[in-house]
């Protein structure tokens, strides 16, 4: 018994790993700084009870279990017993089982069992063991019949005695429970759902009272036993596949063992598995008087199986190296596996004459299964095999990949025969250990590796770690061969390493996976605290992991921070949120998403998203998806939201609608293939959605009845979904890390030579001497891979630079208000995203060019450009800038007409000064001689042709955009009016061809209008979707334009687009849009501010500059504003291009990386999973210097613990302060800190809180600091507190044992209050504030001098009220000093020399030069600060 007690001694070191903080992953050396915030976090753990005492008490209960014949007599009906102790009977006295004669008369019982199954030989021994022992262990190889036959043996025995029995058999997988139950019914000729039935989740085959044999998933039985708290509902409990050791199974073993000893001593427990560790299970269920018997059933092996180890293969020519200790595959390892393939091929070739089987037949039936740890290793192995095939054409191999991310179609390839004359080699992960059986496999090459998911319980970051596989795994892999013919297994480790170093069994899930589910089940079991219950596990987790899990459950609202009002480290009372979470087969954060969906009345959407996050690989993954446009289907479903989760919701809704409208099965297959969707995963997701909806209904979580007053509009829903995502996945918050870099915006434009960063990418490593303009068309062709047509691309070069600039043109379809099929967030065009995705797939592009001398001869022979001093000057367009209709640099205001409006960000303006010229042109166009050139033949009209087209009652010049498909034989043409900007779809009779003379005169005449956009504003993220201007804003502009001439104030002119302010009688339209919450104030980008600064300085000097000089300066200004033009030359023939250049790119200056906002992730690099819509992470609003938050549904950690990977990401709305507001709304608690003068809130520290006595944080790993960059006011904190109160009210009940009492009417009131409060909170126009830096930002402060806020729900609040200091008025002396500083900065504004660095005290920024100072004074931050300190320019 000493050995047994030593086994149960949880004070011994049950470590998950050797890492600090009691975590399974996380490297203290990963931190890059020695600051106090970056040092490894350590926490002292003190349990509430001695673990030994817990284990000893449990063992005393087990010791009361006595085996022997007396247990077969029972004095009471077991299915009616609450407890064996109910009648205070003697220990050895058992209830008598009632007769079940009526039941046995009702159904046919055939007692002839299948004698050919190996298990049959052990039938008598099995039944004897069950009869005499409370616990029996049955070890039987796969296929021996134990799962189907043993329960029938028990049932047959009861039939013979006419005794009642009720058998439950658990299965780890749903499909197994269903298929086995149906197989038993078929074998016994029972109607399914009668004698034998199944239950998976909430789905029962029937509710028949006649069911005596129930197959169910492990979780079903576990939940039943937790609810009943007794085993006596069953006579026999059969736990199958117990070797799986997942958390449900380990916790079920705790419950069964506890209840068996406590109140269910006469229930029989049978443990079954093919690879069970019998010694461990015997010890676990041993009592002082007996050990559970082990019955073994084996059927032997029909065909021989030979195993080889690396050191036994002396005849293979490879390097003799010592066995590596660190798990991994070296380059030599891959080559050695290829050598084994060659040895197999030679062996079968030589055996052809000595065997009845031909060499070709041996190849066909001699497939090779290579076990590799992951997809990357599969790809590397495939490359090595392909390399050998390329060098040796006689080696013919068909490579088949097999992993969990494959489509179902690809999985079928595993079972297909190879091509004629080929050998099939299957490269697989451990999925083929048990899930897939391939009959033609004769050889296994096993690298003895596996990737196992571990969890760092302190950070909640999971990590897929490469490890040596267990011997059990290796034996299962070896079992894939030798089934239909003899087989060989090659293990790529030495025999000594395999026998002595590798573990017999893998690490149980409870020691490496999240414990949230187990802790919640322990709370529901209510037989002790989580640490006490989990100490009874077969492999108990250490106290640190239990403590971390309890902290995490407190963070998500599943547990209160206290037990009966007193704080407990290792425990907390269960909340109703926790009860809900325990009923869902989901991660607790996904359950939290459903709860918030219920509260904010988007329950269906939340359920769908949660289901989408729970199934694997909704989108297909593979070579095709990396190289084609299939990936962009993710963006189509995300619809510009920047959210993988919203994409899941939309793809599901489209799929369900399609299934309802398309009855043909082939249609859904074609749809799934077209949109790169895994149909299998979608169907699994559909079933999970149905399951979750049933579970919600059982908990009375249903959507509010349909009504206009409480339904979200589409615009609102796009925001509210992101709000509940931010709430559900707090604190997985990330920010982009380049927004605070000084001169960020200047560097962006500098890197692309002043081009528009929202439309431009660039390549590097082009050699300038190769005369790049000759190859512009070749560069454009590189983008055909991304389906970007060459006509939408301009390619330019900068003299002496190694960069090639690629700018994507605006689409003429903009004039129809159409949108791209692929929507992306913000201002950046879709083509830029596609270009960056191209580089992610392949970072190098090859471009064939001529050498310099040949190229010079080539251009001279063809008169392309000019060669001067052995340097080529390419042809370029000469700008007649005096003809451009663009505002002069000296003109601040212009009067004229808005001729056409696309939206507030794009409209066209005709200056009044051109009125006479336009009238004259109209008169010429409409002269009879010009209108006589009718279009006789539609083929004469081509895209790009200039002609005359009817606009209203007059003809105007136009250009053909598109020839529309003919309908009813009447061709129509889409034209754009050159001098007005609008477009029309016209028939042939409304068009006129231009006379040659007229076309010649007007061909070079630029449009008599210019493009404009509203300055200093952008669409409000609250009222618009994906940076689109709201319809109401466009209507306000249209109404103003219809009133006649307008006065524009030109802010800047960049790329021939004027940023303007439109003056009205009662103000400025730009400001009115902000007042109506249709727009928000915004900074202008760097080039716009630079141009504005230049313009205002020129306008100040206007009175001193003569008119002729003004014209000269303006022409120079306009000429400078024109960007280099695409030469678009015919490239030299490829047979003349003998030099190949490897271009790198394309790149964008707007590419971002992320930082974790959690303390534990501060110094780790962050990447986004490659399949995400945010994998290409660009600064979609480069002019906006505010942080835009990204939320991840889950975070994994690299094997080296220095890199985080964010999965299921969502880009939050670009609402200033949104990240801080969401953290305040959904964090457990927070402290909002003031500046030293207490005049403004500047920083918030959010987390689980702190010990009021020591000020030590409870969960410092998850503490989060957010430095505020906008004003947060006391009123905002009041609104947030009201929202937190309403969220708590939805589920609160003063009696913890009852369900929440809020009915439909109460829910409606709460929902409408939440809706109004959220609208107020997000709709505010917040002023910018300067950033503050704190040395002690992670320190919780003693705020005992602050009057605590009233707490309506006391310590039963999941979201307690936030307290905060009242703000003081700004000190007058300080205000005067800031005003003086501001005046000094404006004095330096006109200085033209070299300036020493100066500080802007208003904004806490250092200004290095006069140019930087001038542009800083134009920022929204500085303008807001001027208002805040009361400074006005004289």
From Swiss-Prot:
Catalytic reaction annotation: ATP + H2O = ADP + phosphate + H(+)
Domain Helicase C-terminal: from-to ranges: 354-526
One cellular-component annotation, GO: cytoplasm
Positions of the Helicase ATP-binding domain: 127-294
GO biological process, one term: spermatogenesis
PROSITE patterns: HELICASE_ATP_BIND_1 (PS51192), HELICASE_CTER (PS51194)
Boundaries of every Tudor domain copy: 938-1001
Cellular compartment(s): Cytoplasm
Placement of sequence motif DEAH box: 240-243
Intrachain disulfide bonds: none
EC number: 3.6.4.13
PANTHER family (alphabetical): ATP-DEPENDENT RNA HELICASE, ATP-DEPENDENT RNA HELICASE TDRD9
Family the UniProt entry places it in: Belongs to the DEAD box helicase family. DEAH subfamily.
Protein name: Probable ATP-dependent RNA helicase spindle-E
Organism of origin: Drosophila grimshawi
